[in-house]
Amino acid sequence: MIPAWVDGGLTPVEKLEVHQKGLKHKAVSVFLMQGEHVLIQQRALEKYHTPGMWANTCCTHPLWNETDGDCAQRRLQEELGITGIPLTYRDTIEYRAEVGDGLIEHEVVAIFTGQAPDSLTFTPNPEEVMATQWIRFNDLAADMARAPENYTPWLHIYLRDHVTTILGGDR
């Protein structure tokens, strides 16, 4: 059950139902950085939407009554096995995107960033993540322009409309 707006108020709703009906719902997105590089992940083929597509470091929906910050840390650990990196809340944004098979993400997203040490090692959960890559934001944007079909709709939105939010005005 994830927090979604129904009749103007937040209520717990099954995740698949939220996406089938395109309900506005809470979400969290994390961007881990190492200097000029951001960690991106290729979603596992078993994911029920956007399988095999590249996305930001991790993203998810908070559980009912879970804080956004706790959710971000939980999902870093569940998807990538990463713990102990302090995260900075950047802002909350809203977007709506079709993600295939009649499913819709209409998210109110808390954006978090973190600085990963050069010594960071991690083991992705193969049920969630097929591959990872450290890439410069400029190179990521260029590759997304060359092969947009390889990237999730929300990553396109983040890079098109919210880079300053993600980077905190650092670049």
What label would you give each PLM region?
Residues 40, 57-90:
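The catalytic Nudix box helix
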Residues 14, 52, 93-94, 103-171:
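Nudix hydrolase/Nudix homology domain
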Residues 16-20, 93-98:
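Short, solvent-exposed loop/turn elements at beta->coil junctions and helix N-caps
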Residues 27-61:
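A glycine-rich, hydrophobic loop/mini-helix early in the fold
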Residues 19-22, 47-51, 131-132:
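A short local loop/turn or secondary-structure capping micro-motif enriched for an aromatic residue
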Residues 30, 58, 89, 110-112:
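A structural signal for short, well-ordered beta-strand segments
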Residues 1-29:
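Acidic, metal-coordinating catalytic segment for phosphate/diphosphate chemistry
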